[in-house]
């Protein structure tokens, strides 16, 4: 009887130890474990949004250069698929804010939220003009400044009501 209890206890301890040591504590564990990400090339995140023109920035964030960002809307639904892919991805052009990347003109997004970021204004309107297949309305002068100001105002009020789906 004592030998059977000892055997059961030893087996339970071994299985517990095995479970603790083999765990990977972030959702998309790459091949080779969590420290192997430095050796891997980052792929572009999944396309999303109208016509697949955007890129996923998080499980509920889809941003496109010409369209802005969709947070928690139908356009961002495809981004939930990123959670099930085995390799990490990266969207955006340059780093900004605290752990984010420039997602659209004047907008910096991390995998959880987006904020207005002045350093992300540069380059986006030039990029959209350079694209021959672009069918978006181009903004210059006062219209552009008004749109950017509205984005900034929306970013400052973001913390007030973060549960509602929004489009930037």
UniProtKB/Swiss-Prot annotation:
Glycosylation sites: 135
Glycine amide: residues carrying this PTM: 32
GO molecular function terms attached to this record: neurohypophyseal hormone activity; neuropeptide hormone activity; protein kinase activity; V1A vasopressin receptor binding; V1B vasopressin receptor binding; V2 vasopressin receptor binding
First and last residue of the signal peptide: 1-23
Cellular component per GO, a single term: secretory granule
Sites marked Important for agonist activity on V1aR/AVPR1A: 32
InterPro entries: Neurhyp_horm, Neurhyp_horm_dom_sf, Neurohypophysial_hormone_CS
SMART domains (alphabetical): NH
GO biological process terms on file: grooming behavior; intracellular signal transduction; locomotory behavior; maternal aggressive behavior; maternal behavior; multicellular organismal response to stress; multicellular organismal-level water homeostasis; negative regulation of apoptotic process
Keyword Transferase: no
Keyword Signal: yes
Pfam families on file: Hormone_4, Hormone_5
Record localization: Secreted
Protein role: Neurophysin 2 specifically binds vasopressin.
Quaternary structure, from the entry: Interacts with vasopressin receptors V1bR/AVPR1B (Ki=85 pM), V1aR/AVPR1A (Ki=0.6 nM) and V2R/AVPR2 (Ki=4.9 nM). Interacts with oxytocin receptor (OXTR) (Ki=110 nM).
PANTHER family to which the protein is assigned, alphabetical: NEUROPHYSIN (PTHR11681), VASOPRESSIN-NEUROPHYSIN 2-COPEPTIN (PTHR11681:SF9)
Protein family membership: Belongs to the vasopressin/oxytocin family.
Protein name, UniProt field: Vasopressin-neurophysin 2-copeptin
Taxonomic source organism: Rattus norvegicus (Rat)
């Amino acid at each position: 009887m004592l030998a059977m209890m000892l055997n059961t206890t030893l087996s339970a301890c071994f299985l517990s130890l095995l479970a603790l040591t083999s765990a990977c504590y972030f959702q998309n564990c790459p091949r080779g474990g969590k420290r192997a990400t430095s050796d891997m090339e980052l792929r572009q995140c999944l396309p999303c949004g109208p016509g697949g023109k955007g890129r996923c920035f998080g499980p509920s964030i889809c941003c496109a250069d010409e369209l802005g960002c969709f947070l928690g809307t139908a356009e961002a639904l495809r981004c939930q698929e990123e959670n099930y892919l085995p390799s990490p991805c990266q969207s955006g052009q340059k780093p900004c804010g605290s752990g984010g990347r420039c997602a659209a003109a004047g907008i910096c997004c991390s995998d959880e939220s987006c904020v207005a970021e002045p350093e992300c204004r540069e380059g986006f309107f030039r990029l959209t003009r350079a694209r021959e297949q672009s069918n978006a309305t181009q903004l210059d002068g006062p219209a552009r400044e008004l749109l950017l100001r509205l984005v900034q105002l929306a970013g400052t009020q973001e913390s007030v009501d973060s549960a509602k789906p929004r489009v930037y």
